[in-house]
Amino acid sequence: MTLEDSASKELKWWAIPGQFLRQELLPVLTNLRLAIALLLLIAIFSSTGTVIEQGQSPAFYQANYPEHPALFGFLTWKVIQVVGLDHVYRTWWFLALLILFGTSLTACSFTRQLPALKAAQRWKYYEEPRQFQKLALSAELDNGSLNSLSQLLQKRRYKIFPDREKENILYARKGIVGRIGPIIVHIGIVAILLGGIWGAMTGFMAQEMVASGDTFQVTNIVDAGPLAAQVSKDWSVRVNRFWIDYTPSGGIDQFYSDMSVLNKQGEEVDHKKIFVNEPLRYRGITFYQTDWGIAGVRVQFNNSPIFQLPMALLNTKGQGRIWGTWVPTKPDLSEGVSLLAKDLQGMVLIYDPNGKLVDTVRAGMSTQVNGVKLKILDVIGSTGLQIKADPGIPIVYSGFGLLMLGVVMSYFSHSQIWALQKGDLLYVGGKTNRAQVAFEQEVLEILDRLSSEPKIEEKETAIEV
């Protein structure tokens, strides 16, 4: 073995990874079936994340997805938590699907779309009549000139490329943007995927139930990405007021929260009234109005100070939502009554220890209970807020913008026309990548215009030029 043979083998050894990428891995990544399969999987798991509630507590899944009976025979709370269906969009396998799909699109762009664009920007002049026979659409005219053809093509927004050396040859094209469109579509989809991945890695979701008049900071984070930043503690949010608008039949029409953002000194730096589909946004964090509840009730016994008692949501076994609390009517707490409320319309039901309805009182009214005057001053509502931060949203929106732009660009047909003047004969031919019928009609109209022009005038025009 010579030194040259040894060096050659060493070079081949180092070339193996590159050859594997080009010959084995790249054809798989650019395979259309793989891209379609990945897209279907992403769509299926995305819909799963929409159907199955995301970011809830383990107790929620245990209550709604029990082991016996299992939903569809297999879907239980254990399966949901093991597979990660309670946080689909942050699981390693879902992010891996996004990365693989993005890699496939990128590889396809570099191996197919970019070479196709470069090929579309290169052309050869047709110098022989036989070359026009290869085109799908061609014609031979005995009265026509390149000068007239060039003018007609320019009126139809074709870009003319005459041969500088030979004046009897012409090439024209339009719609090259249609070749760029698919590349822009791929860039847009990749941007959407990158935005989704970045949002999953750096975003978070929190939930807060805040009573009217309370101030809070974002602390109850239920789901967060591994790279999510800590929420700054130099600002807080105050719920100035929470209220519900009811329909004449007693149903809920809309619920509102009047909210203020406070700085460290307690000064208001932002203010907004939020309701469903109209959130508050501050420093990249969005506060959505999603739920409501009853936080407490303010009562007074005879002429005593005013007490604010908390109310808890009772278990009604799916028969609606009712909040309740217990109010002592004697100093030694030996006797008392239960107060129940189901909405914020101010109606409070009073029950004795035996479960008998004693009275029904509206806010601002009073009643006698166990020899004590009990006055219901107010029922205090609480707003349910879903708080999200997703730094990937601007990237996703930009990706959708590029996607729509690319789709529009792709509708432009890339049309090409060649022409050759041989004595009195004019050879014209063309092709397009889409809208073949419209292109044929356009070329036929151009040929009709050329044929209708007198031959003598064409010669005179050519001499003048």
Swiss-Prot record:
Q: Does the keyword Cell inner membrane apply?
A: no
Location relative to the cell? Cellular thylakoid membrane
Listed as disulfide-bonded, the cysteine pairs are none
> What topology does it adopt in the membrane?
Multi-pass membrane protein
Broad class of where this protein is predominantly found: membrane
Q: Name one GO cellular component term.
A: plasma membrane-derived thylakoid membrane
Quick check: keyword Membrane in the entry? Answer: yes
The family annotation for this protein states: Belongs to the Ccs1/CcsB family.
The transmembrane residues are 32-52, 91-111, 180-200
- Which protein are we looking at? Cytochrome c biogenesis protein CcsB
Source taxon at top rank? Bacteria
Per the record, the GO terms for biological process are: cytochrome complex assembly
- Assembly: May interact with CcsA.
Which Pfam family is one of those matched by this entry?
Answer: ResB
